[in-house]
Curated annotation (Swiss-Prot):
Keywords: Cell membrane, Membrane, Metal-binding, Transport, Zinc
Cofactors demanded by this protein: Zn(2+)
Subunit structure: Forms a complex with DabB.
Lineage, opening ranks: Bacteria, Bacillati, Bacillota, Bacilli, Bacillales
Principal localisation: membrane
Protein name: Probable inorganic carbon transporter subunit DabA
């Protein structure tokens, strides 16, 4: 046996073996511990998740220190990222200096200011200390003569298995992880495996308990250790904690350590527990399985020495830092008094790598903020320049909409609007012939209504038969592939067709993809459909359709959010957005985050149809919102991969609306060409001068070997809430979420509050997902797409036994193996409104205030006089 950490009495209170852990109610401990992970939903509906959503009650830098101490995870940008940003001119070093001076002013050290500044300036270059200095005998001698720091770091309680190695030198926690991954995959499988886990209906813990006695990966003695274990998960967890002698005061921290060992699988268990009352205790069951397995594995090594050391600070790097960065000689150091040495050591310890990276990150963020403010303020439009729009097009706030909107406005008398892509209709959508519905709204909300597609009975019956034929063929193929006997015959039966498909997909992907898609559409011949907008009295968990009051409420709310309560154009187009890619497990990550990881076209159709209802218009007119008689609402979907606008719902148009429609159609090829060229030029190794942008965009969408069909929301950095005139003349480089807002129409502040709670939260989650996947890809990302394995129908792993990877793949944030494309900046929220509006928002929304104060988002405002203020 090997102990990988020295255990001392000083770190942990003496274990009181009289504590009867079995009598403790673990619910509070588990609920509190679960804050260190975030729910993880299936990849088929991939929506952004903030990995630190449960930790926002703590400052960002404290969480950074905690993660570094507990998991050795650094959530600040690496030195190489910072150098690259500096070399590209993305960081103004004046802001680094300002941050340094503020830090020096706020700390009191008995060190000359010029000496401290010289040390800090050299250390901020982020160069590593020379290895020959660290290993020198002279330094070793100085260390032996030094009394050291009067400071000891805390060590957080880790799983006991992390301290033990087996005879082969492998840590037992790694073996434990392997077992837990295996059982988690079996239980959570979503119809991918041919055989389901026996006794699954009894719950995770009970199913595991039935099968563990037959696990060949465990020895007979290990299986016997849990043979008589309690049949209830919470009792088993209590039993395991008691057997491991975990002190009551350390239980929560101990559970946190186990949850953080496999945050992906634990996050999926947490999400499942929140979705179903049947699985409400699933996280408890997960911990019961994991810690019971730990007990079975480490029993022969117990009891461990009742000592776990505090992590004492190594002073060698601190002395070396003063010699290398501070310019001190070995002789000068040896001549210092003990108190002087302690003062210098304390200073070097405080100005550690984390603080240095923090100063660089804040300077990076301030540089972006400063340049954005200059760009916006310098290009403010003069009053009265606005012309009446022939058409108004409402797009999702998604950063990919910004270049498309900018180019569209250049080509004609069009006004574009930004709004969350579910358009304020909290619905579950059910497509024609489907038995399943999708919650097409932000993950943080629950659907209030279900809207179904339907068609005439005779037409639908024939369509459904054609659809079932395709489904049956696909199901038969999958069944044969998973069956032990029929899988031997499958290559002979399917080989010719699959060979032809593989060759076509590989050598002519664009033509092959178009041919297969056209063939499928020609066979299905999906009929024209209608939507179940009207309330169905049939009782259901979620009501089908809307009541008359709901129709008016949702239409009114959306129009106010878009600022369309007056001066409404003849044609208003509600534009959802989606993406197009082939052989891409992360396709949902490229769709609309505000629609729960699906395309937003369905929601666009619903809102457009509501706004065309005569009874809705009459009710709105009574409230002072007049929609002109010749105004028509239509719906379209913006394909962000090929930058194409696809019409979904175009009712009978008035003469003025028809003119607007034709003009949009006329300019769309030019818009698409320019946006494709702008977007594709940012992809690595793309030669824009040598290739047709439209053809190349289509190839990216159809090529099944393409690991980066588009950049998605990479480089997102700002969320701007204000009138379109604020940013209309600005090239925001596809980095800003844009939400329309007119403070003059929001006296109560309710609209602003709703934007922050809904779209603002979604944007922040997206931002932090990209941030985390960039700065800590090994822990919060999902690795290389080319080596990923889709598992259990839920997510991806690297290989066949890793954590369930929760973040974005390498190709979504990295330009190359050594160069990041995404700039890891925390989201800047800019509000165009008087100062008192922002003050009221912060006073009423304590959760948002907490995010701002703790550094999870940055906040700025622009008042009517054009004064920019950072909060």
């Amino acid at each position: 046996m090997g102990i990988t950490s020295v255990l001392t009495k000083d770190n942990v209170k003496k274990i009181d073996t009289d504590i009867d852990v079995q009598e403790r109610d673990l619910n509070v401990f588990i609920t509190s511990a679960s804050r260190v992970i975030a729910p993880l939903w299936p990849i088929s509906t991939f929506a952004a998740r903030n990995p630190w959503m449960g930790l926002e009650n703590q400052p960002f830098d404290q969480v950074a220190s905690w993660l570094k101490n507990t998991r050795d995870v650094d959530i600040y940008p690496s030195a190489s990222m910072i150098r690259s940003a500096k070399n590209k001119g993305e960081i103004d070093e004046d802001f680094v200096e300002m941050g340094l001076q503020r830090w020096l002013d706020s700390h009191s050290y008995h060190i000359p200011r010029d000496v401290a500044e010289r040390f800090c300036h050299a250390a901020l270059k982020l160069d590593p200390l020379p290895s020959d200095l660290l290993s020198s005998h002279e330094l070793e001698k100085l260390v032996s003569e030094c009394s050291g720091l009067d400071h000891i770091e805390n060590v957080f309680m880790q799983p006991l298995s992390s301290y033990i190695e087996n005879q082969d030198g492998e840590r037992l926690v790694n073996i434990l992880d392997h077992h837990v991954i295996k059982w988690s995959k079996l239980y959570l499988d979503d119809s991918q495996a041919g055989w389901t886990m026996p006794n699954r209906e009894e719950g995770f813990y009970r199913a595991w308990q039935h099968l563990i006695q037959y696990d060949p990966a465990l020895s007979k003695k290990q299986r016997e250790r849990v043979k008589g274990w309690p049949k209830e998960a919470h009792l088993a967890l209590q039993e395991a904690l008691f057997a491991l002698e975990i002190p009551e005061s350390e239980i929560q921290t101990y559970l946190e350590g186990h949850l953080l060992s496999l945050p992906g699988w634990a996050g999926m268990m947490l999400w499942r527990s929140q979705q179903s009352s049947h699985e409400h205790a699933l996280l408890t069951e997960y911990l019961a399985v994991r810690i019971s397995m730990e007990w079975a594995l480490i029993k022969p090594y117990l009891p461990l020495t009742n000592e776990r050391s505090k992590k004492t600070i190594s002073i060698a790097p601190l002395i070396a830092a003063w010699i290398h960065w501070g310019g001190l000689t070995l002789e000068e150091w040896s001549q210092m008094t003990a108190s002087e040495q302690n003062e210098y050591l304390s200073f070097a310890y405080s100005f550690d790598e984390k603080l240095r990276k923090k100063l660089w990150l804040e300077a990076w963020e301030q540089t972006y903020t400063d340049r954005l403010s200059q760009k916006i303020i310098s290009k403010q439009r003069e009053t009265g320049r606005e012309k009446s729009a022939l058409a108004q097009l409402a797009f999702c706030i998604d950063v990919r909409s910004e270049p498309f909107r900018r180019q569209l406005e250049k080509e004609g008398p069009f006004e574009t609007i930004g709004i969350a892509g579910f358009f304020g209709v909290p619905i579950a959508t059910c497509e024609l012939g489907s038995k399943h519905s999708h919650a097409s709204l932000p993950i943080i909300q629950k659907p209030q209504n279900k809207i179904k597609e339907f068609a005439d009975e005779d037409v639908f019956k024939k369509y459904n038969q054609r659809k079932q034929a395709i489904h049956s063929l696909s199901h038969t193929f999958k069944t044969m592939k998973q069956n032990a006997l029929s899988s031997l015959l499958l290559p002979e039966l399917s080989g010719p067709w699959l060979t032809l498909q593989m060759a076509a997909r590989s050598f002519v992907p664009r033509k092959a993809g178009r041919f297969i898609r056209n063939l499928r559409e020609a066979w299905l011949r999906k009929p024209d459909t209608k939507l179940s907008l009207h309330h169905d009295a049939t009782e259901a968990e979620i009501p089908v359709g809307f009541t008359d009051e709901e129709k008016v409420n949702y239409a009114r709310q959306a129009l106010k959010m878009m600022g369309l309560t007056e001066n409404i154009a003849p044609l208003v187009v509600i534009c959802g957005h989606g993406s197009q890619s082939t052989n891409n497990p992360y396709s949902a990550a490229l769709d609309c985050g505000a629609c729960g990881g699906a395309a937003g076209g369905f929601n666009a159709r619903v809102l457009a149809a509501l706004c065309n209802l005569s009874e809705v218009r009459e009710a709105l007119l009574a409230e002072g919102i007049k929609i002109p008689e010749d105004t028509v609402f239509a719906a379209a979907e913006h394909n962000t991969t090929v930058d194409e606008l696809h019409w979904l719902y175009v009712p009978e148009l008035s003469e003025a609306a028809q003119e607007a429609f034709e003009q949009i159609e006329a300019v769309m090829p030019k818009v698409r060409h320019h946006v494709n060229a702008e977007r594709l030029a940012q992809l690595p190794n793309f030669q824009s001068k040598l290739k047709n942008p439209k053809a190349e965009a289509n190839r990216f969408a159809e090529d099944w070997s393409e690991i980066r069909p588009e950049w998605g929301l990479a480089r997102n950095a700002a969320f701007i809430i204000g009138k379109r005139e604020l940013t209309q003349d600005c090239d925001l480089e596809g980095r800003a979420f844009l939400h329309n807002y007119d403070w003059k129409q929001d006296e109560s502040g309710e609209l602003l509050a709703n934007i922050i709670v809904g779209p603002g939260t979604v944007a922040q989650w997206i931002n932090l997902q990209y941030y985390a996947s960039t700065v800590a890809p090994h822990y919060y990302g999902s690795g290389n797409k080319a080596t990923q394995t889709v598992t259990a129908g839920l997510g991806v792993m690297q290989g066949n036994a890793s954590d369930l990877l929760a973040g974005l793949p390498w190709q979504s944030v990295m330009e190359s193996d050594h160069e990041a494309y995404h700039s890891p900046l925390r989201l800047l929220i800019l509000i165009q409104a008087p100062r008192e509006y922002v003050e009221r928002l912060l006073n009423h929304d304590s959760a948002f205030l907490q995010k701002v104060q703790n550094g999870w988002v940055r906040l700025a405002s622009l008042d009517p006089e054009g004064c920019w203020e950072s909060w």
